[in-house]
């Protein structure tokens, strides 16, 4: 097995571990946030009245502390999820790797469901606490010990009206999380259907087309691939040092191919290629004959007059009849 093929399962397994860690941080932060909100509301709204003297002070400290820790965990998980998504896009992942995170659903869908359930439960508890706990009643008022304490004998439980307002608002936030979960699930289903339809279309395009005309069947070959396929374009884009040779929408010009389409060669090969191109243009038959200069003799050719005299002396001698 090649190292690249062995590295891919390790990378997928590491991504799964990171996804599980992010999910745990989300759930832990959401639970702490809701518990902190409930403790804060109960500590600051109910424990500040004299009819409930047994409310400990620790609730007023533990509530905001839990809420802050939970909010920090949620923010940390969110930032880590963004980093994982960017790393996946840089590696060329087009689809979400967490589509089947838990029970065949995506991680974001599960997170939105958990958030919605927690907020919905918290809002209902706050609403029940604000509605069913009696407020502003005479049973909660202390009896005055003397005439000077008559001003302190007024009922003090009217502060639960804020719980009656905050409860439905938190329930509404929980319902909004359910709506977001439904939208994310629908988007995931649409993306999966589009991907499957695209694959089916590519398979159908690569198959030959049969057309029946009367009793004869005409088979048309599949169309040729595109001039610049997406796979080659992405491979060129990912490979370093090829930024100047990226494919464009139109085919490259002749001059760009002639100038930039050469491969680096040695000096001897380059000189031989130049000689071949030059002698091809000049019309010579072979490069060997044109490259070697002819050997010139050291003696000078005879003069033109000497040639005429030699020809004149040769003709009379040849015209005389031979003796018997």
UniProtKB/Swiss-Prot annotation:
One of the record's GO cellular component terms: membrane
Annotated membrane topology: Multi-pass membrane protein
Keyword Membrane in annotation: yes
Region (Disordered): 229-248, 279-304
Keywords: Membrane, Transmembrane, Transmembrane helix
Positions with biased composition (Low complexity): 229-239
Subcellular location: Membrane
Transmembrane parts of this sequence: 22-42, 57-77, 113-133, 160-180
Biased composition (Polar residues): 279-291
PANTHER family linked to this entry: TRANSMEMBRANE PROTEIN 171
Protein name in UniProt: Transmembrane protein 171
Species, as recorded: Homo sapiens
Lineage of producing organism: Eukaryota, Metazoa, Chordata, Craniata, Vertebrata
